[in-house]
């Protein structure tokens, strides 16, 4: 059985841990949400192939900047997460997360993930952002960012409703077991030296 290591990165509070808990338990976490989810291993079938998927959570806060890269060696695929309702987390995709991954783990495929999809149409959330002259991140903006950082895919999901959640992990596995043909020739990764 092929083993795949998937590491999840992104700003604090974008929903990385909820994403992992919701996916692995089929339930949104209750009151207590840990800073970092314990590493988790699941046997899944994707495209008829049995896969042992190892999921690694990371802490997004700056306090962990020196420790976080210790989980990067031997990673097969990264999920860079941002919250659809947090423009600053979206900016940090290429302000922080993409450069960090390229430095520590070049040539590893990246999936860009917009979290909190259920909140994009939430009136209260929209009003709170508008007060700061901000708006939720659109699907088109996510696609543009995917191309900018040379990610394999851009996906959106909600850990709360589970919409798009399984697809995120299925596509992460596919990025490893069926790398896109155009990338096979060059490299399988999402890092370009500029």
UniProtKB/Swiss-Prot annotation:
SMART domains: RAB, RAN, RAS, RHO. Residues 192-194 form a propeptide. Disulfide bonds: none annotated. GTP binds at residues 10-17, 57-61, 115-118. The modification Cysteine methyl ester is found at residue 191. A motif (Effector region) lies at residues 32-40. Pfam families: Ras. Its main location: membrane. Overexpression promotes the formation of filopodia and membrane ruffles. This is Rho-related protein rac1A.
């Amino acid at each position: 059985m092929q083993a795949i290591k998937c590491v999840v990165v992104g700003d604090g509070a974008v929903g990385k841990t909820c994403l992992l808990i919701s996916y692995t338990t089929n339930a949104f976490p209750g009151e207590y949400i840990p800073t970092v989810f314990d590493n988790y291993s699941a046997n899944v079938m994707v495209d008829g192939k049995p896969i042992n998927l190892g999921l690694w959570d990371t802490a997004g806060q700056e306090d962990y900047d020196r420790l976080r890269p210790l989980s990067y060696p031997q990673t097969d695929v990264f999920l860079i997460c941002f919250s659809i309702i947090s423009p600053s987390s979206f900016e940090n995709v290429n302000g922080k997360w993409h450069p960090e991954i390229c430095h520590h783990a070049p040539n590893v495929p990246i999936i860009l993930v917009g979290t909190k999809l259920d909140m994009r149409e939430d009136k209260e959330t929209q009003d709170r952002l508008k007060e700061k002259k901000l708006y939720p991140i659109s699907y088109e903006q996510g696609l543009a960012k995917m191309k900018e950082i040379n990610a394999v895919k851009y996906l959106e999901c909600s850990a709360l409703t589970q919409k798009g959640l399984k697809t995120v992990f299925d596509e992460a596995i596919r990025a490893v077991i069926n790398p896109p043909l155009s990338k096979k020739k060059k490299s399988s990764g999402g890092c370009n030296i500029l």
